[in-house]
Amino acid sequence: MATPIIKQVPPEYVGGKILFCGTDGRFYNAAGQAVKHSFSPSSQTNRPNMHSSYPMMRQYAHRLCHHLVYETFVGPRTKGMEIDHINGNKLDWSLNNLREITPAENRRCAQYLRVLREKIPHHWQTFEREDYLRFYSMPLDEFKAMLAIYTNTPHPVDWDMTHHCEC
């Protein structure tokens, strides 16, 4: 694994404060100490105690972590574009896992690798689409096994189907 490059986040992105980030997605304060993230309140729910799963730097102007990493190393986002996590893991902010895509493409990618909490306690509903595999460079069987772990299923996924499992 290559040594990450550390760079100062442009002060205008973080309310004039000093913050550093690495290409591995880790953040550091001016003293070189690791900075913890918090989760942003969800704007897409009517339940005020719910949080989205996008980590953000609250003490640094409420900026989303993956936006800070991308904009620090690549530059400002193109107007109307969104930052996507290539592997679907919202906690992986490494620069090689981030890309700029259109909102429509981002929604399409998100629905292929989604895990939704069912209303029935202890049930998960998963949706998988085989055409999402084109974004991964690994054998199909290896990817299916990885996705089975990711979606909390005890067995490989039956592709292009909606299914339920007891967890």
Predicted regions and their residues:
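Conserved recognition-core residues within compact binding domains
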Residues: 1-82, 89-164
